[in-house]
């Protein structure tokens, strides 16, 4: 599943295609969304927001399209009038004079008023987004030490969108390697120095992934500035200590780590 950096880059591509352009045609697959098709024609997309792995497409008249790709959903940008042949099921079509954005295969799609947006169950449950520039390491440290999260093992905590939105498995693996911790560690047991390092890494690594145009790939990642240190590198030598990277399963997900320097 794509993680926060990939979702944000997808949102950037969608924005670049249609932001500020009048919609010339709108189509939704789901019957509960059909009443919004005609009223949206002539409106514009003002911006597209990400909250972890959810996209919020904001329209000029105040409505917001909520979508969550889950495992199979995918957005595409195409030239208007050039819808590609595919076996995927089309769910959303937002068309402008020159560009069209298409959402395939997703099933979690809603149209929200401002009041509904403010009280949406998923958005109420999800934590602050790691790509939100307003979020600071001090904020993250406070969350780590809060009663809600301080006694949680990192193997599960770093996958919990209620802690920080946008983290996923490759980020979990790379962050813990960066700070030399294991999935069994808990915030309450760390020194202040370890907490500081982890609080920074929880923001620095996702943001590096985003800014260096990362694409999820099992071999390399993050372009020239960053590559996977341990993710999908079991059996290889750790570049930090020379130990052999191992693979196990933590919180029902593959976990990669170096037992020699992650202690």
From Swiss-Prot:
GO biological process: base-excision repair
NCBIfam families: PRK10445.1
Residues annotated as binding DNA: 70, 125, 169
Matches recorded under SUPFAM superfamilies: Glucocorticoid receptor-like (DNA-binding domain), N-terminal domain of MutM-like DNA repair proteins, S13-like H2TH domain
Reaction equation(s) it catalyzes: 2'-deoxyribonucleotide-(2'-deoxyribose 5'-phosphate)-2'-deoxyribonucleotide-DNA = a 3'-end 2'-deoxyribonucleotide-(2,3-dehydro-2,3-deoxyribose 5'-phosphate)-DNA + a 5'-end 5'-phospho-2'-deoxyribonucleoside-DNA + H(+)
Active site location: 2-3, 53, 253
Pfam annotation, one family: Fapy_DNA_glyco
InterPro entries: DNA_glyclase/AP_lyase_DNA-bd (IPR015886), DNA_glyclase_Znf_dom_DNA_BS (IPR015887), EcNei-like_N (IPR044091), Endonuclease-VIII (IPR023713), FPG_cat (IPR012319), MutM-like_N-ter (IPR035937), Ribosomal_uS13-like_H2TH (IPR010979), Znf_DNA_glyclase/AP_lyase (IPR000214)
Function: Involved in base excision repair of DNA damaged by oxidation or by mutagenic agents. Acts as a DNA glycosylase that recognizes and removes damaged bases. Has a preference for oxidized pyrimidines, such as thymine glycol, 5,6-dihydrouracil and 5,6-dihydrothymine. Has AP (apurinic/apyrimidinic) lyase activity and introduces nicks in the DNA strand. Cleaves the DNA backbone by beta-delta elimination to generate a single-strand break at the site of the removed base with both 3'- and 5'-phosphates.
Cofactor binding: number and manner: Binds 1 zinc ion per subunit.
Essential cofactor(s): Zn(2+)
PROSITE patterns (UniProt xref): FPG_CAT (PS51068), ZF_FPG_1 (PS01242), ZF_FPG_2 (PS51066)
Classification via PANTHER family: ENDONUCLEASE 8
Keyword tags: DNA damage, DNA repair, DNA-binding, Glycosidase, Hydrolase, Lyase, Metal-binding, Multifunctional enzyme, Zinc, Zinc-finger
Protein's UniProt name: Endonuclease 8
Similarity section: Belongs to the FPG family.
Protein EC: 3.2.2.-, 4.2.99.18
Origin superkingdom: Bacteria
ZnF (FPG-type) ranges: 229-263
GO molecular function: class I DNA-(apurinic or apyrimidinic site) endonuclease activity; damaged DNA binding; oxidized pyrimidine nucleobase lesion DNA N-glycosylase activity; zinc ion binding
């Amino acid at each position: 599943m794509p993680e926060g950096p990939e979702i944000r880059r997808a949102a950037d591509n969608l924005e670049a295609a249609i932001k500020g352009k009048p919609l010339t045609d709108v189509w939704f697959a789901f019957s509960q969304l059909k009443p919004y098709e005609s009223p949206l024609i002539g409106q514009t997309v003002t911006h597209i927001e990400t909250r972890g792995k959810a996209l919020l497409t904001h329209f000029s008249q105040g409505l917001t399209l909520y979508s969550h790709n889950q495992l199979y959903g995918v957005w595409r940008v195409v030239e208007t009038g050039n819808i590609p042949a595919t076996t995927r099921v089309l769910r959303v079509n937002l068309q402008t004079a020159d560009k069209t954005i298409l959402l395939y295969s997703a099933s979690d799609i809603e149209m929200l008023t401002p009041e509904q947006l403010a009280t949406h169950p998923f958005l109420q449950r999800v934590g602050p987004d790691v790509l939100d520039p307003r979020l600071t390491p001090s904020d993250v440290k406070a969350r780590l030490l809060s009663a809600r999260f301080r006694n949680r093992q990192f193997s599960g905590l770093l996958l919990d969108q209620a802690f920080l939105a946008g983290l996923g498995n490759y980020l979990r693996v790379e962050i813990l390697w960066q700070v030399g911790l294991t999935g069994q560690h808990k915030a309450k047991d760390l020194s202040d120095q370890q907490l500081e390092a982890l609080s920074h890494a929880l923001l620095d690594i996702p943001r590096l992934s985003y800014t260096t145009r990362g694409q999820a790939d099992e071999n390399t990642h993050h372009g020239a500035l960053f590559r996977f240190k341990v993710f999908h590198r079991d059996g290889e030598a750790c570049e930090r200590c020379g130990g052999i990277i191992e693979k196990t399963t933590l919180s029902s997900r593959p976990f990669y780590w170096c037992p020699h320097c992650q202690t």
